[in-house]
A protein has these predicted regions:
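Active-site phosphate-binding and catalytic loops of NTP-dependent enzymes
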Residues: 82-90
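Short amphipathic alpha-helical interaction patches enriched in hydrophobic/aromatic residues
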Residues: 19-22, 85, 106
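Cross-kingdom TIR/SEFIR domain
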Residues: 78, 90-93
Length: 106
């Protein structure tokens, strides 16, 4: 059986220090993450033609047709997070660690 392969950019993101943040105030961090996803992250993914492949508790795996779209999406989300974190103490900031890979997917 032949596998169909395609070139894709895969963006993986997770919250830096999620366990620490959740340990301090789990209800608040979950509410903030839901708001970030609905107000910033998910719309930005759509604008840059991404498709959410999988969500984990504190992260996501997202497929893009173009590495340029993946990088632009990551920059826009990170910029939005900087704006939303302004004025918050460091221990309450939600920050994402992001990696992008370009290669064949099945």
């Amino acid at each position: 059986m032949s596998e169909t392969r395609k070139l894709a950019a895969i963006l993986v993101a997770d919250v830096v220090g999620y366990s620490r943040l959740a340990g301090a105030d789990e209800d608040r961090i979950l509410a903030r993450l839901r708001a970030l996803r609905s107000d910033l992250i998910d719309p930005t993914i759509v604008v840059h033609h991404g498709r959410i492949v999988k969500r984990t508790g504190d992260g996501s795996l997202i497929e893009f047709r173009s590495v340029v779209d993946a990088v632009r999406c990551a920059i826009e989300v990170q910029t939005g997070l900087i704006e939303r974190n302004a004025g918050l103490p460091a221990e309450r900031r939600i920050e994402f660690r992001v990696g992008i890979h370009l290669g064949d997917v099945v």
